[in-house]
């Protein structure tokens, strides 16, 4: 069974790269019916203190560098340190965002944020060492359920992050057609090395 699953995953990966239109249709017609199970020692913790927020900044620095590497210039990537992101997280926390850390035993290896005011999810990151274990899917599901007052929460995703978009579609999220941000290297002062867009996705179950 595991070999068949692996072969199926490899086939879908080739389709994603060669025929993204077919892959999109497959994702929308094959929802995830069962998420990975939470394991012993794995939990989410609400960020309450400066030490935890510093952990979030470190996770965000690693996550943003990974996501932005294909589209940002090297100078901007080098700026993405924990100290660079900490002020942003601090301001967001003051303005209604709640952040949660994902722990495996006592090690923080992922994070996600939710904003109850506007029904938005953001800053979904998993460390490189913890990727491929289903943590991202579990955290997104956790975050959505933290917003019961919003039937259709939203989030932003880079158009170049096709793997994430595919996963989110299989979890009931859809692109709304709204472009939240555009980054064009032709514009003066931009940090983008190639043109990219942050797209809005909405949960539609």
Model regions: which residues?
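A short, internal acetyl-CoA/4′-phosphopantetheine-binding micro-motif in the GNAT/acyltransferase core
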Residues: 121-131, 157-158
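Long, charged alpha-helical interface segments
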Residues: 1-27
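A short beta-loop-alpha structural element at the N-terminal edge
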Residues: 43-59
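Conserved acetyl-CoA pyrophosphate-binding loop and the N-cap/start of the following alpha-helix
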Residues: 130, 134-142
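Conserved GNAT-fold acetyl-CoA-binding loop/helix
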Residues: 64-87
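Conserved beta-strand in the GNAT
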Residues: 101, 106-125
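A short helix-loop-beta-strand connector motif used in the catalytic cores of GNAT acetyltransferases and
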Residues: 83-101, 120
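C-terminal "cap" of GNAT-fold acetyltransferases
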Residues: 153-165, 169-174, 178-205
């Amino acid at each position: 069974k595991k070999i068949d699953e692996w072969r199926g995953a490899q086939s879908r990966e080739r389709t994603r790269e060669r025929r993204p239109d077919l892959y999109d249709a497959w994702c929308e017609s094959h929802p995830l019916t069962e998420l990975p199970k939470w394991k012993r020692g794995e939990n989410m913790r609400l960020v309450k203190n400066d030490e935890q927020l510093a952990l979030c900044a470190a996770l965000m620095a690693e996550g943003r560098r990974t996501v932005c590497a294909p589209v940002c210039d090297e100078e901007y990537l080098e700026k993405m340190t924990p100290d660079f992101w900490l002020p942003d997280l601090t301001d967001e926390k003051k303005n209604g965002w709640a952040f949660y850390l994902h722990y495996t035993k006592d090690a923080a290896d992922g994070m996600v944020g939710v904003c109850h005011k506007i029904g938005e999810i953001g800053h979904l990151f998993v460390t490189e060492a913890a990727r491929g274990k289903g943590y991202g899917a579990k955290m997104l599901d956790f975050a959505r359920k933290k917003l019961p007052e919003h039937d259709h929460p939203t989030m932003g995703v880079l158009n170049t992050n096709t793997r994430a978009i595919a996963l989110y579609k299989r979890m009931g999220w859809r692109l709304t057609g709204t472009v939240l941000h555009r980054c064009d290297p032709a514009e003066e002062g931009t940090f983008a090395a190639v043109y990219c867009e942050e797209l809005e996705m909405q949960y539609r179950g």
